[in-house]
UniProtKB/Swiss-Prot annotation:
Taxonomy, superkingdom: Eukaryota
CDD domains reported in the protein's UniProt record: Ribosomal_L18_L5e (cd00432)
Source species taxonomy: Eukaryota, Amoebozoa, Evosea, Eumycetozoa, Dictyostelia
Protein family (similarity comment): Belongs to the universal ribosomal protein uL18 family.
Gene3D superfamilies: 3.30.420.100
UniProt subcellular location: Cytoplasm; Nucleus
Species of the source: Dictyostelium discoideum (Social amoeba)
InterPro entries hit by this protein: Rbsml_uL18_euk, Ribosomal_uL18_C_euk
Protein name: Large ribosomal subunit protein uL18
Keyword Transmembrane helix: no
Gene giving rise to this polypeptide: rpl5
Keywords: Cytoplasm, Nucleus, Ribonucleoprotein, Ribosomal protein, RNA-binding, rRNA-binding
Known function: Component of the ribosome, a large ribonucleoprotein complex responsible for the synthesis of proteins in the cell. The small ribosomal subunit (SSU) binds messenger RNAs (mRNAs) and translates the encoded message by selecting cognate aminoacyl-transfer RNA (tRNA) molecules. The large subunit (LSU) contains the ribosomal catalytic site termed the peptidyl transferase center (PTC), which catalyzes the formation of peptide bonds, thereby polymerizing the amino acids delivered by tRNAs into a polypeptide chain.
Length: 292
């Protein structure tokens, strides 16, 4: 069959409807979003919560969000740039830091809802699959669905580290084990020890040790911030273990410092009076005559 040119008629253009702006920009998957925010009609005004996980080049964003007609509202948020308060000063976007950010979000949210003592999550991190169970005659666990946005949901992806941290922190998020680091697709089993190693940054420590012995220049280049902060491979597991304890002890956000603006002068100059204008002109003339 020969080439047939597609002729777009006047009717085509008059009936053409553009896609949503964020779809045109490649920012939102609206099929996914529709499934995540559509609530059962018999639940009326009950919000449907999403655990939003986003990984950027320099930060990890974890939020619990619910939607209304006017837009999205953030119930609680935690960020990887808060982790230095808990002792994690470098590697803020690796797998272990993603887990810690998810844990921070969960403990902060449950403290806000006064459920922190009732649902403590998995206090012993062993890498096994954990789901929060409801307590009889008490409020049910806080439930949220994972929202990964446009991220690829491959096995070992860091968005699932945020999920694991939130679940171990006490939030109920429906999930399986197939996407965690350490899952074997052939045997269809999760190696809990491997996942635990990722949660405590052992994969980073082993790579640091490897580069130290094989390529000193690459080690100094890749792990320059670790060297600057005095973090050795043997210290990493302890750093994350202490961070988990510190997060559980006090997950509240840092208090904002109030800045005083009283001493700052306004950039808007007040209008000169006629007397001031004449005096200014006279001073300019006098200085000009003095230079002659």
């Amino acid at each position: 069959m020969g080439f047939v040119k597609v002729v777009k008629t006047k009717a085509y253009y008059s009936r053409y409807q553009v896609q949503f702006r964020r779809r045109r920009e490649g920012k939102t998957d609206y099929q996914q979003r529709h499934r995540l925010i559509t609530q059962d009609k018999n639940k009326y005004n009950s919000p449907k919560y999403r655990l939003v996980a986003r990984i950027t080049n320099t930060d990890v964003i974890a939020q619990v969000v619910y939607s209304k007609i006017v837009g999205d509202f953030v119930l609680c948020a935690a960020y990887a740039h808060e982790l230095p308060r808990f002792g994690v000063k470098v590697g803020l976007t690796n797998y272990a830091s993603c887990y810690a950010t998810g844990l921070l979000l969960a403990r902060r949210l449950l403290a806000k809802l006064k459920l922190a003592d009732l649902y403590k999550g998995a206090e012993k991190v062993d890498g096994k699959v954990f789901l929060v169970k409801p307590v009889d005659d008490k409020p049910r666990p806080f439930k949220a669905n994972l929202d990964v946005g446009l991220a690829r949901t491959s096995t070992g992806a860091k968005v699932f580290a945020v999920l694991k941290g939130a679940v171990d922190g006490g939030i109920y998020v429906p999930h399986g084990e197939t996407r965690f680091a350490g899952y074997n697709a052939e045997s269809k089993k999760l190696n809990a020890e491997t996942l635990r190693g990722y949660i405590f940054g052992k994969h980073v420590a082993s790579y640091m040790t490897l580069l130290q012995t094989e390529d000193e220049d690459a080690y100094k280049k890749i792990f320059s911030q670790y060297i600057k902060n005095g973090v050795a491979p043997k210290d990493i597991e302890t750093i994350y273990a202490n961070a988990h304890k510190a997060i559980r002890a006090n997950p509240a956000p840092a208090a904002k410092s109030t800045k005083s603006y009283k001493d700052i002068k306004s950039k808007n100059l007040s209008k000169r009076t006629l007397k001031q204008k004449k005096a200014r002109v006279a001073s300019i003339k006098a200085s000009y005559k003095a230079r002659l």
